[in-house]
Amino acid sequence: SVAVAGAIIKGAALTFNVLQ
């Protein structure tokens, strides 16, 4: 669903920000 996809993208973005 869109909500699940949004949560995954949000999580990926947060992880990416932490790794930088």
UniProtKB/Swiss-Prot annotation:
Organism: Actinia equina (Beadlet anemone)
Name of the protein this chain belongs to: Equinatoxin-3
Oligomer and partners: Octamer or nonamer in membranes. Monomer in the soluble state.
GO biological process, alphabetically ordered: killing of cells of another organism; monoatomic ion transport
Primary localization: secreted
Biological function: Pore-forming protein that forms cations-selective hydrophilic pores of around 1 nm and causes cardiac stimulation and cytolysis. Pore formation is a multi-step process that involves specific recognition of membrane sphingomyelin (but neither cholesterol nor phosphatidylcholine) using aromatic rich region and adjacent phosphocholine (POC) binding site, firm binding to the membrane (mainly driven by hydrophobic interactions) accompanied by the transfer of the N-terminal region to the lipid-water interface and finally pore formation after oligomerization of monomers.
Domain note: Composed of a long N-terminal alpha-helix and a core region rich in beta-sheet structures. Before the pore formation, the alpha-helix binds the lipid membrane, partitions into the lipid-water interface and stabilizes the monomeric molecule on the membrane. Finally, it traverses the bilayer, thus forming the transmembrane pore.
Region (Plays an important role in the hemolytic activity): 3-12
Family: Belongs to the actinoporin family. Sea anemone subfamily.
